[in-house]
Amino acid sequence: MMDSVLEEDVTVPGTLSGCSGLVPSVPDDLDGINPNAGLGNGVLPNVSEETVSPTRARNMKDFENQITELKKENFNLKLRIYFLEERMQQEFHGPTEHIYKTNIELKVEVESLKRELQEREQLLIKASKAVESLAEAGGSEIQRVKEDARKKVQQVEDLLTKRILLLEKDVTAAQAELEKAFAGTETEKALRLRLESKLSEMKKMHEGDLAMALVLDEKDRLIEELKLSLKSKEALIQCLKEEKSQMASPDENVSSGELRGLCAAPREEKXRETEAAQMEHQKERNSFEERIQALEEDLREKEREIATEKKNSLKRDKAIQGLTMALKSKEKXVEELNSEIEKLXAAFAKAREALQKAQTQEFQGSEDYETALSGKEALSAALRSQNLTKSTENHRLRRSIKKITQELSDLQQERERLEKDLEEAHREKSKGDCTIRDLRNEVEKLRNEVNEREKAMENRYKSLLSESNKKLHNQEQVVKHLTESTNQKDVLLQKFNEKDLEVIQQNHYLMAAEDLELRSESLITEKCSSQQPPGSKTIFSKEKKQSSDYEELIQVLKKEQDIYTHLVKSLQESDSINNLQAELNNIFALRKQLEQDVLSYQNLRKTLEEQISXIRRREEESFSLYSDQTSYLSICLEENNRFQVEHFSQEELKKKVSDLIQLVKELYTDNQHLKKTIFDLSCMGFQGNGFPDRLASTEQTELLASKEDEDTIKIGEDDEINFLSDEHLQQSNEIMKDLSKGGCKNGYLRHTESKISDCDGAHAPGCLEEGAFINLLAPLFNEKATLLLESRPDLLKVVRELLLGQLFLTEQEVSGEHLDGKTEKTPKQKGELVHFVQTNSFSKPHDELKLSCEAQLVKAGEVPKVGLKDASVQTVATEGDLLRFKHEATREAWEEKPINTALSAEHRPENLHGVPGWQAALLSLPGVTNREAKKSRLPILIKPSRSLGNMYRLPATQEVVTQLQSQILELQGELKEFKTCNKQLHQKLILAEAVMEGRPTPDKTLLNAQPPVGAAYQDSPGEQKGIKTTSSVWRDKEMDSDQQTSYEIDSEICPPDDLASLPSCKENPEDVLSPTSVATYLSSKSQPSAKVSVMGTDQSESINTSNETEYLKQKIHDLETELEAYQNFIFQLQKHSQCSEAIITVLCGTEGAQDGLSKPKSGSDGEEMTFSSLHQVRYVKHVKILGPLAPEMIDSRVLENLKQQLEEQEYKLQKEQNLNMQLFSEIHNLQNKFRDLSPPRYDSLVQSQARELSLQRQQIKDGHGICVISRQHMNTMIKAFEELLQASDVDYCVAEGFQEQLNQCAELLEKLEKLFLNGKSVGVEMNTQIELMERIEEDNLTYQHLLPESPEPSASHALSDYETSEKSFFSQDQKQDNETEKTSVMVNNFSQDLLMEHIQEIRTLRKRLEESIKTNEKLRKQLERQGSEFDQGSTNIFASGSELHSSLTSEIHFLRKQNQALNAMLIKGSRDKQKENDKLRESLSRKTVSLEHLQREYASVKEENERLQKEGSEKERHNQQLIQEVRCSGQELSRVQEEVKLRQQLLSQNDKLLQSLRVELKAYEKLDEEHRRLREASGEGWKGQDPFRDLHSLLMEIQALRLQLERSIETSSTLQGRLEEQLARGAEKAQEGALTLAVQAVSIPEVPLQLDKHDGDKYPMESDNSFDLFDSSQAVTPKSVSETPPLSGNDTDSLSCDSGSSATSTPCVSRLVTGHHLWASKNGRHVLGLIEDYEALLKQISQGQRLLAEMDVQTQEAPSSTSQELGTKGPHPAPLSKFVSSVSTAKLTLEEAYRRLKLLWRVSLPEDGQCPLHCEQIGEMKAEVTKLHKKLFEQEKKLQNTMKLLQLSKRQEKVIFDQLVVTHKILRKARGNLELRPGGSHPGTCSPSRPGS
């Protein structure tokens, strides 16, 4: 067993030993923890040699101590085991069994002891835990008690200190008060002394005053005595006076003068004496009184002073008493506080004692516990020492080593963790640097983003500029294309003109005879027609111009509105400055144009007022001629005949008569051809798809109207009219084709211009004029029309020329009575008209028509005066009267009278054929002709030229007249026959038309009867469709550039194209029109075209009233229901199709113009047809005939007669005009009754009703087509909306709402389409849509003012106006819808207000419409009643006189209506402008919001930059702090190194001194030995010498060395103290460099004293050198410090210290601190130092050289060794001592030189004045800082630039807003000027004019 134990022991490593001595060797813990407590559990005890508390963490030293103790115990245990084994082997050499037994027993005991030990260890662990818990509890309680006691003591101390402070303050205050009080008492004492002295003086004075008072009393007594004497004397005087009076009473006879003289002398003497005495007394008295008063005042003042002094002294006494009381109270309080402080101090001492006692008790308890523990440990140690079990000890040691290794690993982990923390700190620092870099990168990114934004803005502006340039380029190309096409057309027209001139020259001679025949009849009619005023034509043309100016003004307003909408869009889309500038330019141009329009309007108004006043003066003169005017043709042809009269002789006129006979024959063939065409028309059954052009429909309806009107006359004359109308239709269709292909709107105008310039010449006007007409016709012929038209122009011209000749003959016979006053006015009127045309040409510079008129005026300036005026009138007439012949048949019907039927029948065809060129030209251009026809229906014929002043001077004979009259009568008879045939044919045509209109489902254009030329068009329907589509597309393109002209072309003649081309649009919409153009096409063209066709039919229907009122009412009701359904559809569109606003907003500008144009046209047509067609025709014809009479024919007598008649007629006219308004309704009813009496009227009414039915069906079809197209448009819009939703991020709810609304709109359109197809009544939907209808009614009523409100028109006419107003409202309603949608998208608040406004307007308009319908019905009933009361015979007589009144009243009424309509439109325009301004304001507000947002962003960026700057500055400060810390640490290190070096130097110095002392002692010993030898050798030889001299020198050297040693020790101690002080003050010196100078001043003077002390007298040269050095350094250091800033206090300290230490020959290093010596460098190639040090070094070197030379000499003089041996040894000691002294001095000089060298230091020369080490870092930092500053500066610059741009855009928006305000003001002025017009055109100043609009 022992072997096994030993073997186990062998396995233990050598570092471990036995554990037998482990437990006793471990000392006990203070807290009583048993070190064995953890051993039983395998835990290493926590106790090292030092007493370690269990809670404290152990460090490596504890573990090492423990390991060493364990090793020692292990070794001891091993030794004990070895000795015990040896002892056991010695004892037990016997049998081993006993040993085994004892061993087994011992093992058993050991096991039992182990168990006991474990139990005890567990008990000990429990006890130790209990003790620990108790100790912790007691310790925590003791700590808490201590803390409470400490807190209380602290509180008490604080309170006491506060009280003490307060008391000290109070004491100081009280002392101050006491001092003040003492000072006050002293001052009071002084004052009292003064007062007492003053009182004594006052008393003395008072005694003097008493004496004075006695004197005064005496004087007062004297004064009183004097007063008494005075009184007595006065009494005497009184007595004397009484005596005198008594004496005077008895002696009355004595003279009064004597008595007075006697009394006066004594009285004066007495009075003088008394006065003198009184004065003296008074003066004395006054002086005494003054002195008394002064004395009294002095007394009072002194008494007051004494009283105040007494009061002050009392106060002071009281204050002193109060202060003493306060002092006593304060002293008491101080004593109390002192007692409290003593008590508290005693309590504090007791508490301390208690604490100490508790601590001592605790320590005693712990000591007892420790003693118990030590006893237990001693027992356990004894047990262990007895048992000596190796295995358990080894296992425990192993466990403990494992624990130690674990703890070591834990410590290493902690160390690693700390290292990681350090690394993390470094990483955080690097992260901070990274964040700085990131911030810099972000700044750079921001700058790049700003640059990118600027580049994007620049690219955007460039793209916008390029787009605008492209648009301009495209427009220029379009303009070039148009000009090229116009040039081509000009070339073609010139060719045709040449051909026409040839044809005219061939046919010219055939027409002379017929002109002679027609001249007689024209002369007959001339007698009657010469009384018409000449100015009416110009008036009418001026009225047309005025109305056209109204239209232009409206168009300008609409254009400006479009520009405003475009401006709003551009503001919303982009902030481009170029767009804004362009919009500004547009606004300026509009403003200028508007100002010009206003000026032209004012001039126009002036001229109109003058013309109206002139016409008013002439109107009365023409009344007498109305009964004589019989023939319409005689009026129409007189002017034109004048042109040819001056060029033809009588033979030529006879030839023209024969030509006229030939013409009648040809007319017969034409009549036959017309029969054939009517038969073909009726046989065809109208199987075609509809006529391709609505031009035919408009012409045909007017043709039918003319035929109906002619049925009332008993003669047949319609064959020529129909033929002429057919010609017109064919020609107009051809010119329409030509226009649509060429794209030229004003081709016709060029022809008129050339014609007028030719006609103005005087060479051959007839031929040129005819050539111009033929030239107009020539390019318009197609292949199938040429056969019909080849013979017609020549024949028609022959007829016209014959009639002109007859007119000339008749005019020669006309009396000149009525000519003078009328021709006199023509030049003035013509001149005014010229001015009017010029102003209008300026008012619309883009209108080519006006420009052509202006060009004609310029050309006409070359001809004579009359020609100029004629040409000016003519150019205006070209615009105003182009379609007169189209409606002449209608006028003829009203002009026919039973008296002159034969003559009129004979002349009518000739008239119609007399101007074929004009008719063809007028109908050839659809836009101009139909527009002007709509403008004015007055049949004013255009004159070829009026420069014909000599044409009336040709001779004429009576024979020619009679011949011509007979021939004319024959021709009239033939014409009667032809007209009867024509009437029959006409009736057949009406029946065919009725059959056509009666079809159940008529085609779209069935209502337009096909003319005779229609067959030609049926052959090529595809070509016509192509023409029409191209024309419609061309119109869409031209709509923006020239709205007025293109609109008039579209809406009056061309709109039939639009619906006709709809099928092609449906089939192939991409080829023809885009969706936008389809919408534009629908809204702007289709509805007005329908309206125009309605107007064409209603012109005839308005006259044909009958008693079928119930039927008409039913029709009106049906139409209203259909219209309401249509309005519901419109409202649904208005409500739901918000997405279509972008497509429909394009139409806003044109629709208003269309509405404004269309409605006055409808009103004018109706009124003109109703009132003034017949009368105005004749009236105007007379004006035109009489206008151009030459002024040479005016007679002075006739002029006087005319003046008288004018005055009379003006008076009568004034009276009649006052009665006009009263007679208005009666005249109209009578006139309608006259028309209704003829039987064919009722047939025509039936036909008109059938026509209305067909028209309604057509309208339903049109509505169906519109619904189909709008539904398709809605489908495309829904698809586009879905794509937009996919493309953009839109709110889902909003998108869903929009999609639902669009779907509802599409469903409504489908329902409406089905209703149009099925024809069901819409009344079912009315209940659910009453609210919608109210809104539509209000919208209708907004345009009620444009409807004719006059009570004259019949119900059918009112109905047609109602329909047209509804259709025009559709476009206007779309406009309003678009505007409301726009505003609802932009500003949602506007939608509600607009909705309410629309509802109110619709309601009011609906009410007014119903009232107008009721008044129309009442008027119809009145017409029917009054029609039965008059017979036919009186109608014709009465009508001639009544129609003037009716025309006047109708014109007045119409002008009023027109003014109201224009005012309303202006109000609406201003309202629209206000809305646009509001939108602009909103856009401005949005811009300001965006500006503020940008400013906020700018502020945030600025704050970010400031924050970055602050962070950068903070980082810089942090870096500087770190640099300073590094410097400080470097300085500290250098100081420590220098201290170590100094100590080493001191040690080396001491060693050297010791060595030198030892050498000297050895030398001394050798000398002693030599002396002894010498003494021994020769006892007498040394006596003669002085051996003590050498000893004395050695002793002196030793003493000097000792002194030097002592002084070096002193200097080392002082240096050590100074080094410690410097180390203590090192941080302060690093921060405060100012102290270094003081240290320098202190440190430098110390060393010379030390040098003086320890150098002594032995080395005077050394001391002198050192003094020189330090004196020079003293003198120079301040200068060097001031001159060279790198030298600091530390350096000077190092110099002084080194110089101090160098006195002891210590090598010194100059201390150079970084940061102060910027030039110092270890690797420097230069040396820097003071010049004094350098000079001292040179001195030392020279001294050393001298010493070495002396030593060299001594060594040479020394005797050789042989001489020494020989015995010559006497003189040796002296040279040896000198050599030793020279060696020592050489050493000292070398050391001093070394020290001087150490004072210099190595430097590197400065590079550009900067330190290469430190300044590079500073330079880098500065460079980074400057970079950051530059970046910030650039960013601020960019932000400022953006701010400037924003401010500039804001200013531009302000400028735009100001311009808009200015334009708004101008519009207001224009509206005011327009509102002035109704006041000027009151009934008394109006004329029967017909302005067209």
From Swiss-Prot:
Residues 926-1208 are annotated as: Interaction with MAPRE1. This is CDK5 regulatory subunit-associated protein 2. One of its GO terms (molecular function) is calmodulin binding. Residues 1469-1486, 1500-1519 have a biased composition (Basic and acidic residues). Keywords: Calmodulin-binding, Cytoplasm, Cytoskeleton, Golgi apparatus, Microtubule, Phosphoprotein. Residues 1015-1071, 1347-1381, 1467-1486, 1500-1521, 1675-1706, 1752-1774, 1874-1893 are annotated as: Disordered. The keyword Phosphoprotein applies. One of its GO terms (biological process) is positive regulation of DNA-templated transcription.
